[in-house]
């Protein structure tokens, strides 16, 4: 599902950068370019969940990023990093994942290494790891 995450990240980035509507969130050409089966319902569902879920919860996601990133305002963050972070936070907070939550962070790091700047992977790892630790601490306190 890594390829689907990459496509979702690209769409989230594109919508943010172009300030465009999400009317056509399902870019068939991109999906076909990746060799993914556009008729596969699980692929469509996963992709739509990532994109729609991120934007439907954007205010909450951004507040979490602001709380964890201390001296970094969202305006100062690289737009690629912000798109990866938003999708990563959505995945950690809202998706049931078959593997560990750490695997979600690893996915975000892989995307950052390919599409981000020199230190994007470290920046994203730090923020998502801090969020995961906060989540684990909240669970332990209950």
From Swiss-Prot:
PANTHER family: ANTITERMINATION NUSB DOMAIN-CONTAINING PROTEIN, N UTILIZATION SUBSTANCE PROTEIN B-RELATED. One of its GO terms (biological process) is transcription antitermination. Gene3D superfamilies: NusB-like. Belongs to the NusB family. GO terms for molecular function: RNA binding. Involved in transcription antitermination. Required for transcription of ribosomal RNA (rRNA) genes. Binds specifically to the boxA antiterminator sequence of the ribosomal RNA (rrn) operons. InterPro entries: NusB-like_sf, NusB_fam, NusB_RsmB_TIM44. Pfam families: NusB (PF01029). This is Transcription antitermination protein NusB. It comes from Borrelia garinii subsp. bavariensis (strain ATCC BAA-2496 / DSM 23469 / PBi) (Borreliella bavariensis). HAMAP family: NusB. GO terms for cellular component: cytosol. Keywords: RNA-binding, Transcription, Transcription antitermination, Transcription regulation.
């Amino acid at each position: 599902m890594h390829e689907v995450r990459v496509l979702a990240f690209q769409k989230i980035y594109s919508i943010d950068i172009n300030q465009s509507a999400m009317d056509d969130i399902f870019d068939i050409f991109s999906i076909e370019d990746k060799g993914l089966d556009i008729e596969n319902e699980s692929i469509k569902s996963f992709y739509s969940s990532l994109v729609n879920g991120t934007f439907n919860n954007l205010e909450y996601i951004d507040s979490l990023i602001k709380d964890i990133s201390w001296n970094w305002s969202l305006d100062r963050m690289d737009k690629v990093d912000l798109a990866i972070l938003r999708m990563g936070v959505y995945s950690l907070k809202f998706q049931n994942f078959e593997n560990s939550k750490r695997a979600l962070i690893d996915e975000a790091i892989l995307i950052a290494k390919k599409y981000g700047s020199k230190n994007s992977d470290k920046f994203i790892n730090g923020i998502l790891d801090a969020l995961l630790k906060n989540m684990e601490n909240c669970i332990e306190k209950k």
